[in-house]
């Protein structure tokens, strides 16, 4: 697992201080953007409230629980910036779960774009090129682990 620079960690922690306190509203921005980028992803969410539209999903308590979980994963990554390796097993398992429900590997890139969009919308002028790069660096480490779990789960199913 790659290590993040001290500057990356400082930028990520500083920006997450305010965002992490209001996870759901920021997560809603992230998922709204994700569904704009790929509306087909709505089909992966099967709750008592059908997610036929972005608005249906975003008003579903079950989906908002999923939003909270995603934001908690980001929170965990930020909390473990000094030792992202400690999250390896968790992230591998998360990748397996996403493969099992039909998430495609290219969707991870769209989630990354959506994360950056949320950061830009939420941070305004505090969103700088170096901050963007720091978050990209962290996200690439997280997604690399999830992708390994995704691929491993696919191999297990093929056997």
Curated annotation (Swiss-Prot):
Q: What is its EC number?
A: 1.7.-.-
Q: Which UniProt keywords apply?
A: Cytoplasm, Heme, Iron, Metal-binding, Mitochondrion, Oxidoreductase
**Which EC main class describes this enzyme?**
oxidoreductase
Explain the purpose of this protein. Monomeric globin with a bis-histidyl six-coordinate heme-iron atom through which it can bind dioxygen, carbon monoxide and nitric oxide. Could help transport oxygen and increase its availability to the metabolically active neuronal tissues, though its low quantity in tissues as well as its high affinity for dioxygen, which may limit its oxygen-releasing ability, argue against it. The ferrous/deoxygenated form exhibits a nitrite reductase activity and it could produce nitric oxide which in turn inhibits cellular respiration in response to hypoxia.
Name the UniProt record assigns to this protein = Neuroglobin
Q: Which GO MF terms are attached to this record?
A: GDP-dissociation inhibitor activity; heme binding; metal ion binding; nitrite reductase activity; oxygen binding
User: Any idea where this protein resides?
Assistant: Cytoplasm, Cytosol; Mitochondrion matrix
Classify the main location: cytoplasm
State whether it acts alone or in a complex, and with which partners, per the record.
Monomer. Homodimers and homotetramers. Mainly monomeric but also detected as part of homodimers and homotetramers.
Residue ranges constituting the Globin domain according to the UniProt record: 3-151
Q: Which family does it belong to?
A: Belongs to the globin family.
Q: Which domain of life is it from?
A: Eukaryota
Catalytically driven reaction(s): Fe(III)-heme b-[protein] + nitric oxide + H2O = Fe(II)-heme b-[protein] + nitrite + 2 H(+)
Q: Which Pfam families match?
A: Globin
Would the keyword Aminoacyl-tRNA synthetase be found if you checked this record's keyword annotation? no
Q: Name one GO cellular component term.
A: cytosol
């Amino acid at each position: 697992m790659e290590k993040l620079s001290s500057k990356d960690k400082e930028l990520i922690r500083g920006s997450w201080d305010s965002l992490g306190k209001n996870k759901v509203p920021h997560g809603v921005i992230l998922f709204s953007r994700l569904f704009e980028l790929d509306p087909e992803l709505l089909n992966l969410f099967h709750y008592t409230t059908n997610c036929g539209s972005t608005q249906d999903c975003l008003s579903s308590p079950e989906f908002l629980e999923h939003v909270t979980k995603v934001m908690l994963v980001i929170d965990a990554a930020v909390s473990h910036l000094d030792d992202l390796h400690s999250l390896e097993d968790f992230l591998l398992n998360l990748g397996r779960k996403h493969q099992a429900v039909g998430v495609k590997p290219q969707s991870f890139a769209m989630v990354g774009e959506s994360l950056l969009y949320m950061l830009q919308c939420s941070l305004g002028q505090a969103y700088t090129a170096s901050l963007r790069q720091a978050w990209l660096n962290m996200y690439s480490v997280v997604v690399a682990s999830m992708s390994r779990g995704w691929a491993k789960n696919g191999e297990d199913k093929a056997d």
